[in-house]
């Protein structure tokens, strides 16, 4: 009996196949499903029926040679790059049978029944758990890690977080719950050398990693995917498309189907389709979604008072908005005459989303049409979408943001040099309008009406005694960085009552510099300690980081994404009642807010009903079917400490014990900032003075060539020149002798396996771009 699994949907179907004879012994067809089978098992010569028991490592080199068996035993191409290993009953994973008799739930000061139930579900299913912020998602993950650590003594457990600042935070939290010592876990990211990561893989079993690091280590075979028994995804709603979460999951599934998955998130998605994508990507078999109104968690959630404050823009802003609309009105009327814009769309209150939908409809209807008019229409749509976004900044953020975006768009249009945007933003009327705006704002109050309400809310909140407002903390969320900087600067006028600080990401913008991780951590520590009582944050403060409980949340703008909205409001109401104020511009943001709330309620209703979400049915049971673990309430010794973990990480990254290689020493040195030509000369001399080994050649080819486009336009070398016996004295050859040796080596490997030849020829293109030089003397000496 063989169980066949189709790689597209993993559906199980059983079919009786005759016994076959291999080397004088009769037996059933092996249980490996996706194999590299030479011919049909039913029709081929019995002497050739020996199956390949080793599952194929599915990568680009062998993708076209991966097959699966159909119901008649004939090989057919695999529809998806997924490899399924042995059956559940024959899986050979070292287990601790005695430990599997029970599962441990740590004894804490406050026992919550819903955590116990969710832990039990996560132990035996691939679970996607959606809980509001602050209700113990990390605690549940730590319990799952603890029990799989006990049950499978040789397998590895990996906790994935999307950003590096989250790794230390989650490592400390999980270690505190599970009672793990700092030496039992490891924090791995791109800053840790590959040799160090390999050493950690060989000595430890619990890892806190970024998905990019795990993806690279699986690709480079530093970590065997079959050794993974449990994968935990923090902020699991990101696991869609080509995100690193999705790529990690696909890489593990190629060679391992027996591992447990736990996805943690506050909101699984903004629509039913997005939730289904997460379920498909993480191979989820169980979905648990709770909100603050759910019966089983309602008693643990504090009340949040949500108040909407609607504001109207000033008369000066209305005049600026009308004058700007007159500039792009001809392009709007052009599309209106073509009947490409809805009738109810107004030029003054144009919306980018409406234009984007109209653009998509036109693109599909004129897919095969090529004309100058189509190019003009597409360019007009692009221009109007930009103008709609600029108008939105004026309505919802203020004149400064409006002016900065106009200048930025003008500079981009000038650099482009063509299109409708170029003609509008380089025209004389626009130049006059921009100059008029620059002169006019000098005498106006630049504050958006939202700013006045913001100042009133903060003064009202911090009006108590000095002791009172020292213990009060407020977070202000905004979508754009320049708005956050403007708010922080404005709040300086009411110090020391309001001690505000900026909290943004690491990337640099056109007008500001980002905050590195050390600055971010220092800001959070000061906010927790009370040195800072108001934090002005962009999207970086919405998810992930443990900033702590806040007393009041102010949303300076509205987000159409329910995920971002729920995460913003989840920063308050954890330990006591909280307040949430949302500032909305009438006829602009109020509709966006309403759409996000309706979308969130609709998705929650669909998920809770269990309809329209297709869960996976083929998730294997990892523990033997005759074992039913019993719940055990046990107090664990807390061996973790944030300081010890941080010190151990720093010490481990500096001293590399048995793997302190020359490559690591070179990695720890400071970089040389020399011109690339100087580095090329050093490479040439080194390559001529030594004969590299095969491993050194491959390592050399993978090294970082900073001059990737140097000499790209010169003539490439001619291969027949290498094989000829006659070489002129001044013949041009590649600067490095490695090119010649590798090419000749490839000629000698024609009788070897294709993968061996590909390994060398794979990097041939990297040498075509290297400059050509006269090295005939060195060539004659080497030959």
Curated annotation (Swiss-Prot):
**Which reaction is the catalytic activity of this chain?**
ATP + H2O = ADP + phosphate + H(+)
The processes (GO biological process) annotated in the record are: double-strand break repair via synthesis-dependent strand annealing; interstrand cross-link repair; Okazaki fragment processing involved in mitotic DNA replication
Q: Which GO terms describe its molecular function?
A: 3'-5' DNA helicase activity; ATP binding; ATP hydrolysis activity; four-way junction DNA binding; four-way junction helicase activity
Q: Give the EC class as a word.
A: hydrolase
Q: Does the keyword Glycoprotein apply?
A: no
Q: Which residues form the Helicase ATP-binding domain?
A: 118-286
Q: Which ranges carry the Helicase C-terminal domain?
A: 450-619
Q: Where in the cell is it found?
A: Nucleus, Nucleolus
InterPro entries (alphabetical): FANCM/Mph1-like_ID (IPR039686), FANCM_DEXDc (IPR044749), Helicase/UvrB_N (IPR006935), Helicase_ATP-bd (IPR014001), Helicase_C-like (IPR001650), P-loop_NTPase (IPR027417)
Q: Which UniProt keywords apply?
A: ATP-binding, Helicase, Hydrolase, Nucleotide-binding, Nucleus
The protein's Enzyme Commission number: 3.6.4.12
Concerning PROSITE patterns, the annotation shows: HELICASE_ATP_BIND_1, HELICASE_CTER
Q: Which family does it belong to?
A: Belongs to the DEAD box helicase family. DEAH subfamily. FANCM sub-subfamily.
The name under which this protein is listed is Putative ATP-dependent DNA helicase fml2
Q: Which organism is it from?
A: Schizosaccharomyces pombe (strain 972 / ATCC 24843)
Question: Which taxonomic lineage is given here?
Answer: Eukaryota, Fungi, Dikarya, Ascomycota, Taphrinomycotina
């Amino acid at each position: 009996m063989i169980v066949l699994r189709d790689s597209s949907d993993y559906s199980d179907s059983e079919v009786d196949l005759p016994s076959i004879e291999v080397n004088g012994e009769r037996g059933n067809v092996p249980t490996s499903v996706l194999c590299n089978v030479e011919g049909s098992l039913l029709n081929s010569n019995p002497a050739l029926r020996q199956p390949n028991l080793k599952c194929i490592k599915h990568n680009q080199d062998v993708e076209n040679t991966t097959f699966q068996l159909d119901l008649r035993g004939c090989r057919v191409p695999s529809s998806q790059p997924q490899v399924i290993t042995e059956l559940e009953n024959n899986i050979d994973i070292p287990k601790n049978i005695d430990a599997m008799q029970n599962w441990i739930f740590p004894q804490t000061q406050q026992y919550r029944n819903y955590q116990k139930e969710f832990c039990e579900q996560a132990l035996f299913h691939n679970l996607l758990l959606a809980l509001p912020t602050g209700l113990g998602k990390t605690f549940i993950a730590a319990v799952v890690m603890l029990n799989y650590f006990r049950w499978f003594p040789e397998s590895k457990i990996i906790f994935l977080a999307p950003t590096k600042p989250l790794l230390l935070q989650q490592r400390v939290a999980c270690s505190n719950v599970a009672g793990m010592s700092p030496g039992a876990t490891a924090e791995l990211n791109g800053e840790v050398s590959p040799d160090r990561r390999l050493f950690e893989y060989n000595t430890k079993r619990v890892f806190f990693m970024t998905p990019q690091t795990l993806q690279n280590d699986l690709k480079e075979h530093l970590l065997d995917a079959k050794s993974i028994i449990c994968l935990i995804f923090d902020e699991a709603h990101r696991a869609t498309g080509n995100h690193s979460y999705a790529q990690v999951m696909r890489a593990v599934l190629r060679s391992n189907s027996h591992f447990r998955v736990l996805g943690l998130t506050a909101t699984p998605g903004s629509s039913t389709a997005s939730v289904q994508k997460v379920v498909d990507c993480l191979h989820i078999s169980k979905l648990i979604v709770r909100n603050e109104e759910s019966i089983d968690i309602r008693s643990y959630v504090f009340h949040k008072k949500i108040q909407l404050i609607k504001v109207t823009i000033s008369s000066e802003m209305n005049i600026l908005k009308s004058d700007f609309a007159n500039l792009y009105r001809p392009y709007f009327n052009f599309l209106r005459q073509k009947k490409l814009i809805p009738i109810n769309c107004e030029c003054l209150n144009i919306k980018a989303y409406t234009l984007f939908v109209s653009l998509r409809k036109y693109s599909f209807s004129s897919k095969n049409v090529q004309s100058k008019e189509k190019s003009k229409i597409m360019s007009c749509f692009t221009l109007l979408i930009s103008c709609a976004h600029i108008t939105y900044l004026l309505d919802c953020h203020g004149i400064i943001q409006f002016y900065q975006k106009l200048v930025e768009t003008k500079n981009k249009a000038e650099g482009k040099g063509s299109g409708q945007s170029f003609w509008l933003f380089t025209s004389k009327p626009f130049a006059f309008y921009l100059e008029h705006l620059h002169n006019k704002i000098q005498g106006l109050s630049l504050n958006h009406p939202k700013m006045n309400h913001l100042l009133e809310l903060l003064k009202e909140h911090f009006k108590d005694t000095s002791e009172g407002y020292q213990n009060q903390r407020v977070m202000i969320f905004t979508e754009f960085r320049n708005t956050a900087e403007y708010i922080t600067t404005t709040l300086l006028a009411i110090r020391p009552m309001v001690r505000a600080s900026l909290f943004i990401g690491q990337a640099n913008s056109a007008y500001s510099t980002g905050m590195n991780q050390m600055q971010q951590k220092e800001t959070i520590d000061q906010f927790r300690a009370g040195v800072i009582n108001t934090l002005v944050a962009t999207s970086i403060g919405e998810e992930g980081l443990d900033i702590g409980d806040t007393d009041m949340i102010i949303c300076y703008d509205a987000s159409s994404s329910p995920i971002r909205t729920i995460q913003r409001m989840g920063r308050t109401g954890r330990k006591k009642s909280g307040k949430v104020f949302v500032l909305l511009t009438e006829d602009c943001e109020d509709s966006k807010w309403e759409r996000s709330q309706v979308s969130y309620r609709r998705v929650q209703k669909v998920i809770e009903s269990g309809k329209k979400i297709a869960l996976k049915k083929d998730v294997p049971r990892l523990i033997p079917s005759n074992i039913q673990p019993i719940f055990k309430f046990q107090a664990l010794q807390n061996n973790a400490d944030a300081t010890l973990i941080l010190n151990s990480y720093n010490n481990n990254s500096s001293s590399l014990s048995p793997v302190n290689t020359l490559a690591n020493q070179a990695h720890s040195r400071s970089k040389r900032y020399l011109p690339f030509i100087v580095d090329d000369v050093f490479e040439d001399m080194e390559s001529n003075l030594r004969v590299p080994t095969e491993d050194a050649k491959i390592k050399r080819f993978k090294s970082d060539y900073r001059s990737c486009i140097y000499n790209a336009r010169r003539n490439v070398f001619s291969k027949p020149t290498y094989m000829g016996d006659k070489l002129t004295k001044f013949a041009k050859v590649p600067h490095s002798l490695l090119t010649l040796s590798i090419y000749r080596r490839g000629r000698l490997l024609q009788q070897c396996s294709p993968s061996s030849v590909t390994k060398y020829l794979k990097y041939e293109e990297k040498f075509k771009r290297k400059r050509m030089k006269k090295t005939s003397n060195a060539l004659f000496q080497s030959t």
